[in-house]
Amino acid sequence: HLAKICYEQAGITDPVEQLSLVELHDCFTITEIVLYEDLMLSKRGEGWKDALSGKFSKDGKLPVNIDGGLKAFGHPIGASGIRMIYESWLQFHGKAGERQLADPKLGLAHNLGGYPWENVSAVAIVGKELG
């Protein structure tokens, strides 16, 4: 389970409490809901409920795709992952304009791609460099 490994490596035990933002590959609405659950941000079968509750809105418990995600911001195939990392960078450096979160510490960027017979997925925990 990719998310579990990534969280363990980053020292994250409760992603909803410890992450400040998430950028995920929402190429289709159902993909976003499934990823809430796969990334352990929602319990199995409850991603849709969490989405409707506002849990993942800008002012919710864990803001997800506050730049609009792939469906609203755009899906530059081959560069979507870079765009997600860039949005995280903007947030961590206070340069996200109207989308700016108060004081983000850690974020998660998720991307996927490929074909039905060959697929790849990547998860990165990112944050503002300290020191």
Spans of features found by a protein language model:
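Claisen-condensing/thiolase-fold acyl-transfer catalytic domains that form or cleave C-C bonds
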Residues: 1-131
